Amino acid sequence: MGDMYDEQFDKAGGPADLMDDSWVESTAWKDLLKKLHSVKFALQSGRDEITGLLTTLSRQCPYSPYEQFPERKVYFLLDSRANNALGVIQNASAFKRRADEKNAVAGVTNIPANPNTTVTTNQGSTTTTKANTSSTLEEDLYTYYKFDDASTTFHKSLTSLENMQLKSYYRRNFEKNFGVKFGSASTPASGGSGATPPPASGGAVRPNP
């Protein structure tokens, strides 16, 4: 038989139960947080970048019953808090803004208190035209505030991830923590237990008392 982990691997709460969880190599995790921190969320290109970063992040389990935990590498085990925060960031990055993106960087344009317009006709009379307060303006304001919510959610979730203490494992503490050993499966000795080996001198074999 080939090399594999011993029976401790399959015990409740052991490594076998964690194989479907999210594991991220420590360097890749730190690189992800650094890139997310530098993203310009106000720009659509920045939000698209977030989607790409999360899509390419490998979260596969680095071991199996027949594959020993990697040597000289540290992995973080992502718990429910980390996975939820990543999901929130993914949802926030999916926001599509209809208004000009420059407004999101500069802030909301001030709206006059009385935005009515007065026009003088050829006959000398004046007419007053009320500003557009219909659905277009309402949609722009709604879109802005929804964007503001998405931006706030993104930055709060990122800060949470940066301050989160995750469980980290490398080969030695992984195998020590779970009490597992990796190696060749033992095979029973030929001849069965209790068999008496032949004498070196070639003399007669005496029966066991």
UniProtKB/Swiss-Prot annotation:
InterPro entries: TMV-like_coat, TMV-like_coat_sf. The keyword Chloroplast does not apply. GO terms for cellular component: viral capsid. Its main location: virion. One of its GO terms (molecular function) is structural molecule activity. Pfam families: TMV_coat. Keywords: Capsid protein, Virion. It is found in: Virion. The keyword Ion transport does not apply. This is Coat protein. It comes from Tobacco rattle virus (strain PSG).
